[in-house]
Amino acid sequence: MTTEDTQYAHQPVMLEEVLDMWFSQSEGFYVDGTFGRGGHSRALLSRLGENGRLIGIDRDPQAIAAGQQLAASDSRFHMMAGRFDCLPQAVEQAGRPIDGLLLDLGVSSPQLDDAARGFSFLRDGPLDMRMDPTQGESVAEWLSYAAEKDIANVLYRYGEERKSRWIAKRICETRKEQPITRTLQLADLIESVLGRNEQGKHPATRSFQALRIHINGELDALDQVLEQSLETLAIGGRLAIISFHSLEDRIVKLFIRDHSGRAPKGRGGLPLGDELPQRLEPVGKVMRASKAELKVNVRSRSAVLRIAEKVA
Ligand SMILES: C[S@@+](CC[C@H](N)C(=O)[O-])C[C@H]1O[C@@H](n2cnc3c(N)ncnc32)[C@H](O)[C@@H]1O
């Protein structure tokens, strides 16, 4: 283990549930689209046979390094760098359809805990929030020029922040005096607009979530990979998705419903009266972390796991 691994560890969420409900073919081909520190991948490898294959994908340089280390010690595993919607390339490389795709969405504990990554409203650091800091612009860069109305829209859409307009206004007033470049500077600004008292929740929680989702194009990547999964999964292959907030979970829930022949007519982009081709079947009920897991892993509190199988 490297110093970074021990300093910023990540505890995989709902590990047993994922393996029990998602993994079935010991010689199968699996993709972990959100490798992180490989908690789910390592557990999967421990059940995978000699001819089984696993591809890990992540866009974060530290996660990629951890994956490459694993790949060097296990020939059944291969690490790919990039957004998880590079899924078709992964499948092309393997030359066979996938038996399972896992997405454990959002950020990892190492990303949140390392102040230098700029994700945390509790630790001071540069206001960045990019999962891949080599691509695109940081939150600080975006906030330096974005229109007040666009900032308010992002806070409202991705954070469900009711006072989004007030916060956006304060950001635009403040940046005339000084650039907003630090995480605590933004957290304090939001607190000065909303006040402190929010039933144990930091007032900046929703805004930080919104800015992170926006700057990383998270929901767009999710939409894309869900569509790709229909073409890349083998019949009988399973999709397992762990979401951490209602926006993500809603996208996953509607996607499964709209491809399982259960969409109300006129929904899911289909003309009224059209029959839906059934391509996915939900597996079991929506799952949440067990009481035992909640006690030892606070991150599992908001986790929601959905599994679906490709049936046609
Ligand atoms: C919750 S963590 C996954 C943790 C992992 N299951 C484990 O047990 O270590 C999410 C990971 O997915 C990555 N990620 C999130 N969205 C991504 C995307 N669109 N493309 C590629 N990686 C993404 C993040 O960089 C992060 O490392």
Swiss-Prot record:
Q: Which UniProt keywords apply?
A: Cytoplasm, Methyltransferase, rRNA processing, S-adenosyl-L-methionine, Transferase
* Gene3D superfamilies, sorted: Putative methyltransferase TM0872, insert domain, Vaccinia Virus protein VP39
UniProt xrefs under Pfam families = Methyltransf_5
Sample GO molecular function, one term: rRNA (cytosine-N4-)-methyltransferase activity
* One GO CC term on file: cytoplasm
Positions that bind S-adenosyl-L-methionine? G38, G39, H40, D58, F84, D104, Q111
Q: What is its EC number?
A: 2.1.1.199
Which BP terms from GO are recorded?
A: rRNA base methylation
Q: Which SUPFAM superfamilies match?
A: Putative methyltransferase TM0872, insert domain, S-adenosyl-L-methionine-dependent methyltransferases
| Subcellular location, record wording | Cytoplasm
This enzyme catalyses:
cytidine(1402) in 16S rRNA + S-adenosyl-L-methionine = N(4)-methylcytidine(1402) in 16S rRNA + S-adenosyl-L-homocysteine + H(+)
Matching NCBIfam families, A to Z?
16S rRNA (cytosine(1402)-N(4))-methyltransferase RsmH (TIGR00006)
Query: What family does the Swiss-Prot or TrEMBL record give for this protein?
Result: Belongs to the methyltransferase superfamily. RsmH family.
Its annotated function is as follows: Specifically methylates the N4 position of cytidine in position 1402 (C1402) of 16S rRNA.
Listed name of the protein:
Ribosomal RNA small subunit methyltransferase H
**Classification of source organism:** Bacteria, Pseudomonadati, Pseudomonadota, Gammaproteobacteria, Oceanospirillales
Gene field: rsmH
